[in-house]
Amino acid sequence: MTDTQVTWLTQESHDRLKAELDQLIANRPVIAAEINDRREEGDLRENGGYHAAREEQGQQEARIRQLQDLLSNAKVGEAPKQSGVALPGSVVKVYYNGDKSDSETFLIATRQEGVSDGKLEVYSPNSPLGGALIDAKVGETRSYTVPNGSTVSVTLVSAEPYHS
């Protein structure tokens, strides 16, 4: 599995997401009991509590599947070992459209990574910008298409392994 096919997480983020998954799984019997209690109230066609409990169960199960998929494809605590190449787990600085006054520094990772200090923006390697930068070397210019259809060019200024 290559670095672009995995989700890079710090140990702290992995532990936080695993705890959330464990809590959701442990909560399954509570939701099932709630559904059963509401079912016993009578006519299901007009039972708002029953439908709300079923909707909550659906949302919870979707989040469980999302977390299981995320954690099964996670590479924990392993920032890229090399500098100068944009990879998941790299802190990168870019110039937009060749304008040195229009720069941004961010982490290429998932939103779930959620850098705790709040000082560093996070772009997914699956986002247009993150995907365009994967495997770029310092000095290289890449282009990507934004949702409105226009093309933006970015030049990689630096790429360093993330350290929390």
From Swiss-Prot:
Taxonomically, the superkingdom here is Bacteria
Give the Gene Ontology MF terms in alphabetical order.
Answer: DNA binding; RNA polymerase binding
Query: Cross-referenced Pfam families, in alphabetical order?
Result: GreA_GreB, GreA_GreB_N
What keywords tag this UniProt record? Acetylation, Coiled coil, DNA-binding, Transcription, Transcription regulation
Where N-acetylthreonine occurs, residue numbers? Answer: T2
Biological processes annotated in GO: DNA-templated transcription elongation; regulation of DNA-templated transcription elongation; response to antibiotic
Similarity-based family: Belongs to the GreA/GreB family.
Q: What does this protein do?
A: Necessary for efficient RNA polymerase transcription elongation past template-encoded arresting sites. The arresting sites in DNA have the property of trapping a certain fraction of elongating RNA polymerases that pass through, resulting in locked ternary complexes. Cleavage of the nascent transcript by cleavage factors such as GreA or GreB allows the resumption of elongation from the new 3'terminus. GreA releases sequences of 2 to 3 nucleotides.
Q: What is this protein called?
A: Transcription elongation factor GreA
The species this protein was found in? Mycobacterium tuberculosis (strain ATCC 25618 / H37Rv)
